[in-house]
Amino acid sequence: MSANAEKEHAMLAEVLRDNGYHEYRARLQALLDIPELASDFEIHTRITDGFAATWLVKLTERGVLTPVERDQIIPLRTLKSRIERDQPLTVDESDRLFRSAHITAMAEAVFGEAGKAKRWLSKPKERFSGLTPMQMLTTQQGTTQVEEMLLQIAEGYGL
């Protein structure tokens, strides 16, 4: 993830009003064990070092990610191989995992609960030409569009 992208993530998340940013960071910690006070550079380092492949399994087992969303990050066969060899995810895979956790944490902070956030994230949006927000996370541009929509919702500009 570029320094610019990291800065955008921080700025977008910080726009969340009141306790929203704290809630976002607490949820990010619950999802990926990233300390609430971790700097953007520390998050960047975690991504470049590669998350443990088992995090993806845990998030799928907990229902945070569907198997289809998991496969958007890494194919199941490759994931199983990484786990068997005790290898971390690659930088690209870790970046995709972070984007999914980041958007999930933002949605949970905006909607106030995981169930509402999950429903919103899995429902096709006209704005995204019928794709779900989770399907948009395959690129940084798509992720930015989902962030912007969440911020508009947080600011009361509609669903």
From Swiss-Prot:
InterPro entries the UniProt entry points to: Antitox_Xre, Xre-like_HTH, Xre/MbcA/ParS-like_toxin-bd
Keyword Transferase (UniProt): no
Molecular function GO terms recorded: DNA binding
One Pfam family here: Xre_MbcA_ParS_C
Keyword terms of this UniProt record: DNA-binding, Toxin-antitoxin system
Keyword DNA-binding recorded: yes
Record's subunit section: Homodimer. Forms a complex with cognate toxin Res; the 2 toxin molecules dimerize and each contacts an Xre homodimer. Most Res-Xre contacts are between the antitoxin molecule closest to the toxin.
Family affiliation: Belongs to the MbcA/ParS/Xre antitoxin family.
Function: Probable antitoxin component of a type II toxin-antitoxin (TA) system. In vivo probably neutralizes the toxic effect of cognate toxin Res.
Domain writeup: The homodimer can be superposed on the Cro helix-turn-helix binding domain, suggesting it probably binds DNA and can act as a transcription factor as is often the case with antitoxins in type II TA systems. The C-terminus of the antitoxin inserts into the putative NAD(+)-binding site of toxin Res, blocking access to the active site.
The protein's name: Antitoxin Xre
Organism: Pseudomonas putida (strain ATCC 47054 / DSM 6125 / CFBP 8728 / NCIMB 11950 / KT2440)
Organism ancestry: Bacteria, Pseudomonadati, Pseudomonadota, Gammaproteobacteria, Pseudomonadales
Gene, per the UniProt record: xre
